[in-house]
Amino acid sequence: MAQAQYAGTGRRKNAVARVRLVPGTGKITVNKKDVEEYIPHADLRLVINQPFAVTSTEGSYDVFVNVVGGGYAGQSGAIRHGIARALLQVDPDFRDSLKRAGLLTRDARMVERKKPGLKKARKASQFSKR
């Protein structure tokens, strides 16, 4: 018999993560690499595990992630968003706790575009009055 699989898509900045949850031991695989190998920063790995901590499901599911775009922080946020959405399929009762923790909300903040005549989005050359 086929094993239950739960899917979720997460987004953050320019990163898009497609997440699959399979009942297992808590192993997280990102782009066919172990999460410790793929994301070197321990604080970002804690971000990824937040949905499991909120729902008290640590070590209950193996996570398989395909993530593209963005950097480490954006990808970690996208993975967190995808895991939270997949956990909703596992048990709809998780919605209240995940929503209260702010894990189901897509973070709409994006990089501000560079404007012509400026060095960056807001950085201008020094203003001289006279």
From Swiss-Prot:
Annotated organism of origin: Streptococcus equi subsp. zooepidemicus (strain MGCS10565)
InterPro entries on file: Ribosomal_Su5_D2-typ_SF, Ribosomal_uS9, Ribosomal_uS9_bac/plastid, Ribosomal_uS9_CS, Ribsml_uS5_D2-typ_fold_subgr
PANTHER family in UniProt: RIBOSOMAL PROTEIN S9, SMALL RIBOSOMAL SUBUNIT PROTEIN US9M
Alphabetical list of NCBIfam families matching this protein: PRK00132.1
Keyword Phosphoprotein among UniProt keywords: no
Gene Ontology MF terms: RNA binding; structural constituent of ribosome
Keywords noted in UniProt: Ribonucleoprotein, Ribosomal protein
Family as reported in the entry's similarity comment: Belongs to the universal ribosomal protein uS9 family.
Gene Ontology cellular component annotations, sorted alphabetically: cytosolic small ribosomal subunit
Listed name of the protein: Small ribosomal subunit protein uS9
